[in-house]
C-alpha cells in the first residue's frame, strides 16, 4: 500500500468539504499494485524502499519521518517501526472490488462501504502494523466496517474478483496511470499525486464545473 494514497485522500476530504452543497461526490477506488510481485511473506519496508529507489538508510528514515509528519497534521498516525513490512495487496484489492460492487450507484463517498473498507485497510497497515495480505486479518477488517465476515473469508479462500482486478489494472495502465495516488475527476481528467486541496479546487472549478455549465 502506498502511504501517499491515504495522505492524498485526507487532503481530498477537505476538497469535498469545500464543495459541500454545490457538488455531490461519488468516489470509487480502483486497483493498482505498486509491487505486484511482492512475496507472501512481504519485505522489510526500509530495505524495500532502499532497493527500489536506490536511496540510503538515512534517506529512507528521513522520508518516513516526513510522511509521518504530513500524515499527523492531517489526523492520521503512521506507526512504521523497525518491524514494519511491505505486503502484497492483491487480495485486499479483491475485497475492495467486492465492496464496490455492493454499493448502490447513488451512494456518497463518505458513507460508501468501499471507502470505509479502504480507510480501515490503511489503518490496519500503517497504524496498527497488521499483515493486510493475511486472510484472517482481511476478514477481520471487512467485518469491522459491517461487511459479512463469512462471505469475505469465502472470497479470499477462492479466486472471486481476481479477474476483475486484473482487467481493471490493465485498463488503467492503458490510460497511462503509472503510479498512485491518481485522481480521475469526472471520469475523464487525471490529477496525479497527493496534491494540496487548493490545487484540486482550482481544477474542479475551472474544468469540471465549467464543463458542466
Question: Residues of each region from the PLM?
Answer:
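Short, cysteine/histidine-rich loop/knuckle motifs that typically chelate Zn2+
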Residues: 4
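Structural alpha/beta surface segment adjacent to cysteine/selenocysteine redox centers
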Residues: 9-125
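C-terminal cap of thioredoxin/glutaredoxin-like
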Residues: 7-21, 25, 29, 97, ...
Amino acid at each position: 500500500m502506498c502511504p501517499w494514497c491515504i495522505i492524498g485522500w485526507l487532503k481530498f476530504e477537505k476538497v469535498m468539504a469545500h464543495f459541500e452543497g454545490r457538488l455531490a461526490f461519488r468516489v470509487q477506488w480502483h486497483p493498482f499494485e505498486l509491487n505486484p510481485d511482492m512475496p507472501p511473506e512481504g519485505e522489510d519496508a526500509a530495505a524495500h524502499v532502499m532497493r527500489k529507489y536506490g536511496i540510503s538508510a538515512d534517506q529512507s528514515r528521513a522520508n518516513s519521518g516526513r510522511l509521518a509528519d504530513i500524515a499527523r497534521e492531517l489526523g492520521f498516525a503512521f506507526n512504521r517501526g523497525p518491524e514494519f513490512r511491505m505486503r502484497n495487496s492483491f487480495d485486499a484489492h479483491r475485497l475492495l472490488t467486492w465492496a464496490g460492487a455492493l454499493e448502490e450507484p447513488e451512494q456518497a463517498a463518505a458513507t460508501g462501504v468501499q471507502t470505509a473498507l479502504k480507510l480501515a485497510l490503511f489503518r490496519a497497515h500503517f497504524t496498527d502494523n497488521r499483515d493486510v495480505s493475511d486472510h484472517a486479518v482481511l476478514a477481520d477488517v471487512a467485518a469491522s466496517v459491517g461487511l459479512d465476515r463469512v462471505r469475505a473469508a469465502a472470497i479470499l479462500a477462492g479466486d472471486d474478483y481476481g479477474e476483475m482486478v486484473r482487467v481493471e489494472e490493465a485498463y488503467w495502465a492503458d490510460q497511462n496511470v503509472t503510479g498512485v495516488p491518481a485522481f480521475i475527476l469526472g471520469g475523464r481528467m487525471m490529477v496525479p499525486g497527493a496534491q494540496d486541496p487548493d490545487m484540486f479546487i482550482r481544477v474542479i472549478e475551472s474544468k469540471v464545473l465549467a464543463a458542466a455549465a
